[in-house]
Amino acid sequence: MAAGEPRDGGGYYFRFLPHRTFSSLSAREITSRLRQWSMLGRIQAQAFSFDQTFQPYQKDDFVMAFFKDPNVIPNLQLLSDSSGQWTTLGSEVKKIEAINVPCTQLSMSFFQRLYDENIVRESGHIVKCLDSFCDPFLISDELRKVLLMEDSEKYEVFSPVEREEFLFCLFKHLCLGGSLCQYEDVLKPYLETAKLIYKDLVSVRKHPRTKEIQITSSVFKVKAYDSVGVCYPSPKEHEQTFSYFVVDPIKRHVNVLYHCYGVGHMA
């Protein structure tokens, strides 16, 4: 059987957790930032519980069972490609793709190199540059050059492995925003928002013997296909359209972070 194709019996059962709220996306200061970044009304998180033990190697069976579950189908939210309104999955999922996303970072010191390499000044202001395009993004500062331009002088400040980290992915998504994104002049709002969302989604525990903090969540970037093609997170693929499944095997919860690129709420 090919990876990502349905298994007889499914194995997992899910329950929607509507009362699990994510303050990192709803606090007034954060919604103000998301509005500026053209992401408000197009990004959300939802939580579901599941009934069995989970191991990362089971990710394909887990994700397929998720999309087949009768408690998921009427509750999992996505943006309609035609109306731009929130809706639920209207087609049967035939195949899934779940890519492992490393999640090991426990500190925002991960981004200190942006200061060390003079991408951001000591004052926190992002260093400007001459405008250029990395389709569809306007690059007007050194931060976006580091995020997008592989041939830029300082692109190697973050290694390929570090760029795969969930914390880096969150940070990059916030920096790039939606289609009418108004960029920040300073770094702090991006770092603060990425940190809050990361802490809201990812579970940690203290090791009983060493007392060290450990991340217990597994993270997957997910796509689902119906008989026509990609149906989730959106039929229109874009670097800024994504869905991450953050699985806590101890609590048996999965947090789903979703965003669909477009024009966010302005009011």
Swiss-Prot record:
Pfam families: CFAP300 (PF14926). Keywords: Cell projection, Cytoplasm, Cytoskeleton. This is Cilia- and flagella-associated protein 300. GO terms for cellular component: cytoplasm; cytoskeleton; motile cilium. Cilium- and flagellum-specific protein that plays a role in axonemal structure organization and motility. May play a role in outer and inner dynein arm assembly. It comes from the Eukaryota. The keyword Cytoplasm applies.
